[in-house]
Amino acid sequence: VAMVLTMAAGCGKKEDKKDYFVFYVNNELTKVVAKKITLQHTSSGKAQVKELLKDLQTQPEDATLRRTIPRKVKIQNIDLISYQITVDFSKEYYDMKPTEEILTRAAIAKTLLQLSQYVTFTVDGKPLVDASGANVGAMNLDSFVENPGEQINSSQKATLKLYFSN
């Protein structure tokens, strides 16, 4: 009997835990850094979105990184419809400086894009606009360009010879 119970215990459904990445902004506000995690919620959907957002709201163990979502910015609502996640933030989202906002937006979106094809942000129920007032709209992985250099605002100077034909 004990052997049958032992065998039956091993036949239970094993939940596969998948590794995900949470993206954090470094303290110098120059790049986004990925840290691997394993989600506790194995079922897809809103529970996973909430878990990832909670990780983005906490201070990472790595002292060179900052929490992605600033403490004063609150998540007011989360919608998960078809292939799109919409996150509504409090008005304090707009208190970030432009560089911090862009890196924060990239880190949140890249984290959530592991669960959906598109991510949209709203602030107090209205579509997110950037520093120039343009509507940001739905974001996907193609919305972000990786900067291979260390500096976000780096530039290069070169002398070139240009040849023109008539």
Stretches found by the model and what they are:
Residues 1-6:
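Bacterial N-terminal signal peptides
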